[in-house]
């Protein structure tokens, strides 16, 4: 069974008196930094010039160039995009990693795939909230927390686990639960979840359902409402109580269709495709492909993203959301 930690298992003392540098100030960086500060910890921000620099300053943080922040810090939490971390680490972090510093991540991609290879005389840990930065912040302000993962890749000082748990407590994660994992397990399961289910799987399923109805002559608006708009209602019920809760809340007609037709949509061919996707993650093929895509300025990424943004589904969705007061700001 996976090991779990709660408030009583973590001690802020492990990170008190240490200078924490959060490198990056996007959604996750901002949420974590604000929570850490509100927990009484010393936090500075390391950034390259840009809009985030102004935001961090307005939030009351001392903001430094990345290299200067690393020099000042005992704990360096790297919260930059995966594709940017390697280059920034090489030029602005690695030269200033002094003995016994702690290098921290919220995703294992760069460590697991060797884009970042830390020296042996530092701790290397992960604290990965299982929610976006704004949720990390909001739940903290409500006196609750978002669950998180911790992993220890390198324990040079002997204090790596205590530091990871102390940091997790500082962002509010131990108010919920903290699970212990490894960099490998977190990276591979996270990528698989994104690609096969949460992002790639869901969007492809919705798009295929929408196109099937429209191609059969049904109004695009009806297709949108049936395959996308109602998705949140179903997902919320699953989130709150699993499949059983959702199935107890729908009609018997819907449930019979679920049980008898669902496996025809996601059947053996889909399972085979999922296994292939997982293998590409495990053997590093996906990581190499994504790194190469960035080296050549993302031509495939840009084209595919543009195609989906111009899809009829997006046009109809914007129109329908514009008719609903609660969605107008997102239309």
UniProtKB/Swiss-Prot annotation:
- Which GO molecular function terms does the record list? ketol-acid reductoisomerase activity; magnesium ion binding; NADP binding
Bound cofactor: record note: Binds 2 magnesium ions per subunit.
Q: Which residues form the active site?
A: 107
Name the catalysed reactions.
(2R)-2,3-dihydroxy-3-methylbutanoate + NADP(+) = (2S)-2-acetolactate + NADPH + H(+); (2R,3R)-2,3-dihydroxy-3-methylpentanoate + NADP(+) = (S)-2-ethyl-2-hydroxy-3-oxobutanoate + NADPH + H(+)
Q: Where does Mg(2+) 1 bind?
A: 190, 194
This enzyme's EC code(s): 1.1.1.86
Show the InterPro entries listed in the entry: 6-PGluconate_DH-like_C_sf (IPR008927), KARI (IPR013023), KARI_C (IPR000506), KARI_N (IPR013116), KARI_prok (IPR014359), NAD(P)-bd_dom_sf (IPR036291)
**Domain KARI C-terminal knotted positions:** 182-327
* Cofactors that this protein relies on: Mg(2+)
Amino-acid positions noted as binding substrate in the UniProt annotation, renumbered to this chain = 251
Protein origin, superkingdom: Archaea
UniProt family annotation: Belongs to the ketol-acid reductoisomerase family.
Record protein name field: Ketol-acid reductoisomerase (NADP(+))
Identify the species of origin. Answer: Methanosphaerula palustris (strain ATCC BAA-1556 / DSM 19958 / E1-9c)
Write the gene name.
ilvC
């Amino acid at each position: 069974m996976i090991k779990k930690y709660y408030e009583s298992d973590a001690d802020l003392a492990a990170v008190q008196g240490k200078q924490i540098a959060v490198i990056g100030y996007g959604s996750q960086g901002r949420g974590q930094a604000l929570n850490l500060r509100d927990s009484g910890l010393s936090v500075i921000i390391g950034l390259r010039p840009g809009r985030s620099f102004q935001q961090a300053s307005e939030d009351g943080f001392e903001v430094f160039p990345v290299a200067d922040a690393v020099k000042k810090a005992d704990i360096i939490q790297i919260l930059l995009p995966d594709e940017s971390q390697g280059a920034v680490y090489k030029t602005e972090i690695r030269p200033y990693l002094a003995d016994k510093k702690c290098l921290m991540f919220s995703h294992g991609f760069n460590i697991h795939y060797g884009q970042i290879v830390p020296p042996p005389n530092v701790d290397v840990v992960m604290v990965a909230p299982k929610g976006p930065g704004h949720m990390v912040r909001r739940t903290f302000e409500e006196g609750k927390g978002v669950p998180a993962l911790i992993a220890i890749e390198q324990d040079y000082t002997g204090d790596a686990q205590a530091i990871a748990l102390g940091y997790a407590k500082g962002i509010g994660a131990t108010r919920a639960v903290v699970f212990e994992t490894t960099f490998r397990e977190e990276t591979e399961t996270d990528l698989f979840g994104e690609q096969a289910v949460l992002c790639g799987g869901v969007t492809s399923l919705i798009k295929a359902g929408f196109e099937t109805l429209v191609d059969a002559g049904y109004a695009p608006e009806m297709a949108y409402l049936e395959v996308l708009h109602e998705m949140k209602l179903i997902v919320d019920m699953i989130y709150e109580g699993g499949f059983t809760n959702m199935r107890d809340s729908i009609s018997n007609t819907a449930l019979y269709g679920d049980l008898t037709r669902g496996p025809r949509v996601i059947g053996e061919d889909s399972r085979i495709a999922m296994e292939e996707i997982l293998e590409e993650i495990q053997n590093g093929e996906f990581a190499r492909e994504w790194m190469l895509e960035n080296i050549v300025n993302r031509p495939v990424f840009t084209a595919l993203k543009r195609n989906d943004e111009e899809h009829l589904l997006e046009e109809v969705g914007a129109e329908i959301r514009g008719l609903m007061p609660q969605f107008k700001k997102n239309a």
